[in-house]
Amino acid sequence: MKIIVPATSANIGPGFDSVGVAVSKYLTIEVLEERDEWLIEHDLNPRIPKDKRNLLIKVALQLAPNLQPYRLKMTSDIPLARGLGSSSSVIVAGIELANQLGKLDLTDDEKLDWANKIEGHPDNVAPAIFGNLVISSVFKGAVSSVRADFPECSFIAYVPKYELKTRDSRSVLPFKFSYKEAVAASSIANVAIAALLQGDLVKAGRAIESDRFHERFRQKLVREFPNIKKLAKKHGAYATYLSGAGPTIMILAPKDRAKLIQTRIEGCKYNGEVFILDVDRDGVRVEF
């Protein structure tokens, strides 16, 4: 059995802690033979545990404490601590592992409830579960989400070599907004989502780049952001935004402009990689 979970790009400008989209990089968990103790084989960061201390197993055992241990193989091309939902993908995989091995028969909404409790916010875990574009809210502990088709376009991701921890990225945010600022910021988010739902990427792009919730505070943590945003706009991009807490910079562009934008960014010789990604429409899936 294989469990496959997509990467995710959260916030998308003004959709702070609420909006996310699944994209085409993946975490894969292969379930092999039964064992007396959990073993997770991987060639990822050496700091990632290979036993029951791994986040994958910790999550699975929260849902099903008496799971039979297995030998697992973990592979991933999702960059770690870069704003592409690497930890969220592991959380969703752990929930699905418990669901399958423990025969829990969870609905997608139940998976999201669990994932939100563990992660603390739904913007990454929701699209990892449902696929596509997902808009979520949490009120009095209850998660509500809406899945929709993301308009056809390419995602060009510039992924720096340096990490940016979520806690560090959150530390630069203000503790409060004035009522006037909150109204302005939420109205921009409303337009961004409505335009995405209508497939109007030009109007959506303007709203995405007008975010007032977080990007103006976080941009100073990602030194390449201003130049890449300017370059992308020059070559026909709809929008450039910080993916999640950063430092990945995500560009939305027409498919016929993606390769050009990728080449131009690579020509800047920044210390990072550039990927062209697509929307993942499926979310977490299981292959037998």
UniProtKB/Swiss-Prot annotation:
GO process annotations (BP): threonine biosynthetic process
E.C. number(s) listed in UniProt: 2.7.1.39
Substrates-to-products reaction catalysed: L-homoserine + ATP = O-phospho-L-homoserine + ADP + H(+)
Lineage: superkingdom: Bacteria
Pathway given in the UniProt record: Amino-acid biosynthesis; L-threonine biosynthesis; L-threonine from L-aspartate: step 4/5
Binding site for ATP: P79, L80, A81, R82, G83, L84, G85, S86, S87, S88, S89
Keywords in alphabetical order: Amino-acid biosynthesis, ATP-binding, Cytoplasm, Kinase, Nucleotide-binding, Threonine biosynthesis, Transferase
Main localization of the protein described in the UniProt heading: cytoplasm
Subcellular location per the Swiss-Prot or TrEMBL entry: Cytoplasm
MF terms in GO: ATP binding; homoserine kinase activity
Family, similarity comment: Belongs to the GHMP kinase family. Homoserine kinase subfamily.
Record's function text: Catalyzes the ATP-dependent phosphorylation of L-homoserine to L-homoserine phosphate.
Protein name: Homoserine kinase
Lineage: Bacteria, Bacillati, Bacillota, Bacilli, Lactobacillales
Gene designation: thrB
